[in-house]
């Protein structure tokens, strides 16, 4: 699909890059010639992923454990990364989400999502942007992975919708503020792209068929499809795209109603919600 070496010469950091969509994007970046840095909270997972990537692609991969919720830890991570050379791109991918009745959420539950998605994305973006601006480095890019809820809201997933909408506002604001400095900020809003963790937290009973019925194309997205879109947006081919959020959702965003999933959740009983809470926390 892409020319060989599309991302050659670019050094890219993917937060939450050890698993799921972050890992899928990271491997594709390597295949297209980039040098990759992945970060996450679990050092063992990062190292296993990095070793697998090196074996599969022969590319350069650096694993840096970091909790993006901690601003000081993010600064330390960026210092460590820059010791080996500057980044050219940042992918804000670290995320968290769960289904819950909003009136039952504790402050801790709300903070768990906002701190990872909103604060973590902001900390990483500001830390990278400051270093680029101070060095006069141009042709850099921040790509943030959102969800459709950033565009439309999401009942029963309010903290995630709030956080992702905030990251979208950051993306559009910095497109104007940082554009003259040669820094692009863009975003992707994926529809359903099943991963092991998200499927357990967000799909009752682990059945994706109901979700697929809400998608006009009648299927979930494949990880390679998202990875290819991300690769394009980070490449020089997309050099005039700035402040844009691209949805990749099989047409789901254009459904005229709230979707049968939301309507189903509105009719759940207390027992249904109890089962979902147990599933989300790993209890049986």
Where are these regions (language model features)?
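Short, small/polar-rich loop/turn modules that mediate ligand/substrate recognition or access, typified
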Residues: 179, 184, 241-243
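Substrate-binding pocket helix/loop in short-chain dehydrogenase/reductase
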Residues: 101-102, 106-114, 211
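The beta1-alpha1 cofactor-binding region of Rossmann-like NAD(H)/NADP(H)-dependent oxidoreductases
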Residues: 65-76, 107, 224
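Active-site helix of classical SDR
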Residues: 125, 163, 171
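Active-site loop-to-helix junction immediately N-terminal to the catalytic Tyr of the SDR YXXXK motif
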Residues: 105, 153-161, 173, 197-198
